């Protein structure tokens, strides 16, 4: 990205990205066998993807609960983590962990930028009731990196930082942008009604996400 002019609009670029980006880390032990067979879409982790030029990352966080027993009181405590999932399968990376990797990558390469497209990977088998609060807290902790979406956002404004676009809301106004009207249509005419809404501005979006599982 160092070769691209600062005043070039980000929306005019073709940016390499990865689907279910964190599956390259593999899955937690209980999900390894089925996850590798059904849900693994990447062979490289985020650092390795960055090294080969990937700058847009599809993340699917949900709340993972672990119950532990304190030996002194014999009471169970619940630890909640924003784990990255693909469907029912938990990868070995967390939402916060991805930000740590990208922070290090941007500090080493300040002319670059990253885009995160995220959604709540809901499941009837998990309690996601704290998802909104946990996502908002994680993004607030990394607010120095996050850029507010606007349709005329330029490369120069985004260098060294991250544009976070969420398909699900976690607070009234986004930290980055909200994608509204995500489409799964095969027909081009039906792919156009989507929008990206930032804190104060919004832009139209054509979503091409048609797929056929056979």
Description of each model-found segment:
Residues 11-16, 55-59, 114-118, 162-166:
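Structural recognition of the beta-strand scaffold that forms the well-ordered cores
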Residues 91, 95-98, 136-151:
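Acidic, His- and aromatic-enriched active-site or binding-groove loops in soluble protein domains
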Residues 106-109, 139, 166:
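Sec/Tat-exported extracytoplasmic proteins
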Residues 1-52, 65-108, 113, 172-174, ...:
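Long, acidic (Asp/Glu-rich), low-complexity accessory segments flanking structured domains
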Residues 165-214:
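C-terminal active-site rim and adjoining tail of enzyme catalytic domains
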Residues 112-135:
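Internal, conserved structured core segments that host functional sites
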Residues 153-168:
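Short, intrinsically disordered low-complexity segments
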Residues 19-21, 56, 61-65, 120-125, ...:
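Solvent-exposed loop/turn segments at secondary-structure junctions
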